[in-house]
Amino acid sequence: MKNLFLTSSFKDVVPLFTEFESNLQGKTVTFIPTASTVEEVTFYVEAGKKALESLGLLVEELDIATESLGEITTKLRKNDFIYVTGGNTFFLLQELKRTGADKLILEEIAAGKLYIGESAGAVITSPNIAYIQTMDSTKKAVNLTNYDALNLVDFSTLPHYNNTPFKEITQKIVTEYAGKSQIYPISNHEAIFIRGKEVITKRLS
C-alpha cells in the first residue's frame, strides 16, 4: 500500500507528520537533498533534517547526482523512510531518471515504504511536472527530455500556495491550469496524507 506524506515545508508541519506516522523512534531515513544543490536558497534542507532528528529519526544523506547506482540502491533499500527535499524540480527529475533512482523509489513505495516529499519532492509525485515551470527554471536540467514524473498520484501538487515569496506565482499557476490538469495547492502549513487510494489534506490550525 502506498504511503505518501506530501508537504511544502516539512519543518512547519511536524505535528501533522507525527499524526500520519507515530512509530518513529530509531527509524532510519534516506534524506535526498539533490533538488537543492543547484539552488542558492537552501535553508530548508538543514531545517528539514533537524526536524527529522528531533523526532528521534536517524538521517542518512544521499545526493543521487553524485553517488553510484550501487550506493543509491543500498541506501534506498536499507532505510525505513525516503525523504526528498525541495529545490529545483526539473534538476531533481533529471537526476532521478539519469541514475535510475526513480524506478528504485517506485519499487520501495510499492513495497510499502513511507515517502516524504517536501516542495519539489512533492511535485515529482505528479504525473507530469510541466505545470511547475513558472516557479522552477527548466534551464537547470538541460538533459531532461520530458517532464513525465513519478506518477504516484493523479493530481499535481502545488506547494507554497499563497505563501511569500510565491503568492503571485502560485495563483498564476492555479489560474493557468484551471480545467487542464488537477492542481492540488497546499500552503506551508498543510500536508497531503496518502494511504493507498485515500487522499486527505490536513492543515495546522
UniProtKB/Swiss-Prot annotation:
EC number per UniProt: 3.4.21.-
Any one GO molecular-function label of the UniProt entry: serine-type peptidase activity
SUPFAM superfamilies hit by this protein: Class I glutamine amidotransferase-like
InterPro entries from the UniProt entry: Class_I_gatase-like, Peptidase_S51
Disulfide bonding pattern of the chain: none
Biological processes, Gene Ontology terms: proteolysis
UniProt keyword annotations, A-Z: Hydrolase, Protease, Serine protease
Active site: 119 (charge relay system), 160 (charge relay system)
Family: Belongs to the peptidase S51 family.
Protein name per the record: Uncharacterized peptidase Lmo0363
